[in-house]
Amino acid sequence: MLGDRDFRTTIKSSIEAVGKELDYAIDLEDSGKIHASEVTRCLRRSFYDRLDGLEPERSRFSDLLGGMFRKLEYGAKSAQYSLDNLKLEGQADMIVDDIVMIFKSVQVFPDDPFAKDLLYMNACMWIYDKIDGVIIYIDDKGKETSFSVTRDKKMFEETVRRVRTFEALLKEKKTPLVEPSIECSTCQYYERCFTQKKESKTLNLMTVSYTHLTLPTIYSV
């Protein structure tokens, strides 16, 4: 009977399966090739993904929005930017009339682009050698808002610095510092960062210092 079947589990499994298919293709074994998505978010999360990964929880099909565009015929193809002995890899969702585009799902529209989205877009513009980009946010009701951005050299230099830092930490197998953000509460590695098992003490996010963060100042666009 229908009532005896666990549809929530079936739906969750379906979303997770589709999510794996639509995720960025990252070679986790090659520390000489770094994906832009790894260094425009918390480095510790990317570090754990590489060396001791856990599957993230995907709960909404809307979270898969960007990957769906990339899989279409007119979706953007992955590209690389050479950094001497390193390769910075990235993939926009679409490129239309030389304009780089990425799509993100949100529940509430931001007043400005989220820092990690702006950093990722900027990296993509340098990787594809394009000047202009658009970040499009779409909510659960299908409404959208967008931000036009122009590539920025200083911001890209910060991304390159993070690439080199991440590559060095991977080689040394040295865990990066915590970079607190609103995403921590839903991160699959939350307990590794904010729970000290030996002392059975839980750290409060609000008491963690933000002084070590290295993301550049994000300006309105």
Functional labels for PLM-detected ranges:
Residues 48, 190-193, 199:
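Secreted/processed peptides and extracellular or luminal domains of membrane proteins
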Residues 54, 196-205:
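Short cysteine/histidine-rich zinc-coordinating motifs and their immediately flanking basic loops
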Residues 42, 184-187, 193:
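Short cysteine clusters
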Residues 1-100, 105-115, 122:
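Metal-dependent nuclease catalytic cores that hydrolyze phosphodiester bonds in DNA/RNA
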Residues 211-217:
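Conserved small/polar residues in nucleotide/adenosyl-binding loops
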